[in-house]
């Protein structure tokens, strides 16, 4: 129908996509500088970088697909697999905690709702692990 054919335009206008090598994200809501809600879409077989944030924590809610999450043991510096999180499961990432989001599926996109909160929610608050 005509109404449905242009619905993507409204969605794109309200929350434009920011493309990344792993997929894309949309900022859904920013009520103040200390809180931001994003939707991450990770393409099949793709992985975000191992990263941490100094000034914010994150809460991840898996909306669709299966997420695999890795972290770094700060005592041993070994990478640890926190396991898989299926749709409707959630995970808390503390500030300064190394974390990596992976979509191991070769056919289904992973959608995660990310709630960022802390002193600041700026995109440049990121340190990537070599």
Model-identified regions with their sequence ranges:
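A generic "binding-loop/recognition-motif" signal
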Residues: 46, 55-56, 66, 97-98, ...
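A short glycine-rich, His/Asp/Glu-containing loop-to-beta-strand
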Residues: 18-57, 63, 115
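Short beta-strand His + acidic residue motifs that chelate non-heme Fe in jelly-roll/DSBH
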Residues: 49-51, 69-70, 92-93, 99-106, ...
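Double-stranded beta-helix
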Residues: 100-130
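Classical nucleotidyltransferase
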Residues: 1-22
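A compact, surface-exposed functional segment
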Residues: 58-59, 63-65, 71, 128
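Short acidic-glycine-tyrosine-enriched beta hairpin
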Residues: 71-99
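Short glycine/proline-enriched turns and hinge-like loops at secondary-structure junctions
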Residues: 52-54, 62, 85, 104-106
